[in-house]
Amino acid sequence: MPLLDSFTVDHTRMEAPAVRVAKKMNTPHGDEITVFDLRFCVPNQEVMPERGIHTLEHLFAGFMRDHLNGNGVEIIDISPMGCRTGFYMSLIGTPDEQRVADAWKAAMADVLKVKDQNQIPELNVYQCGTYTMHSLEEAQDIARHIIERDVRINSNDELALPKEKLQELHI
C-alpha cells in the first residue's frame, strides 16, 4: 500500500489550531488543486466530540465558501478527518496559508452567530445520513476554542518525518 502524504508528517510536533498545505497537484487540464489540513486539535491530546464535529461539518462548508471563494479560489470539499482532530479542505487554486487562516477564523465567528439548531443547513432525514447526531452547543465550543487560541501555520518541512524514522516504523 502506498504511503499517503498525511502520514509522512510528525503528528507529535503539530500545532493546533493550524493550517498546513497537505498536498498540491494539477489536473490534466492544468487546474491547480490544493488540499489543506485544517488542524483543530493537537493530535493524540485532543479530539472534537462527534456531534459537534458533525454540526460543524454542516456549518463550516458554507461559511468557509463565503470567506474564501473568489480571486482564483473555489472550494471543492471540506470533510472531517476520521481521527476527529481536524478537517481536510480541497480547493481549486493556491491561496496562501494566512488567507486560509483568516477565512477559517471568520467562519468560526459565523458559527458563533447561529442562534439555534434549526439554522443548521441540511439538518433533515433527506439530506443528512445521521440527522439526529448534532449539537450546536458543541460546534460553538469548538469555534470558540479556535478563536481563543488563534490559527497558526504548520510547515511541512518542520514536520517531515525523517526517512530513518519511517524505516524504523516499517513504512
UniProtKB/Swiss-Prot annotation:
Q: Name one GO molecular function term.
A: iron ion binding
- Co-factor remark: Binds 1 Fe cation per subunit.
The biological process GO terms on file are: quorum sensing
- Which co-factor is required? Fe cation
Q: Which residues bind Fe cation?
A: 54, 58, 128
Going by the entry's taxonomy, the superkingdom of the source organism is recorded as Bacteria
Record field: catalytic activity: S-(5-deoxy-D-ribos-5-yl)-L-homocysteine = (S)-4,5-dihydroxypentane-2,3-dione + L-homocysteine
Q: What is its EC number?
A: 4.4.1.21
**The UniProt record lists the keyword Iron:** yes
Provide the alphabetized UniProt keywords: Autoinducer synthesis, Iron, Lyase, Metal-binding, Quorum sensing
Family to which the UniProt record says this protein belongs: Belongs to the LuxS family.
What role does this protein play? Answer: Involved in the synthesis of autoinducer 2 (AI-2) which is secreted by bacteria and is used to communicate both the cell density and the metabolic potential of the environment. The regulation of gene expression in response to changes in cell density is called quorum sensing. Catalyzes the transformation of S-ribosylhomocysteine (RHC) to homocysteine (HC) and 4,5-dihydroxy-2,3-pentadione (DPD).
Subunit and interaction comment: Homodimer.
Name of the protein this chain belongs to: S-ribosylhomocysteine lyase
Q: Which organism is it from?
A: Klebsiella pneumoniae (strain 342)
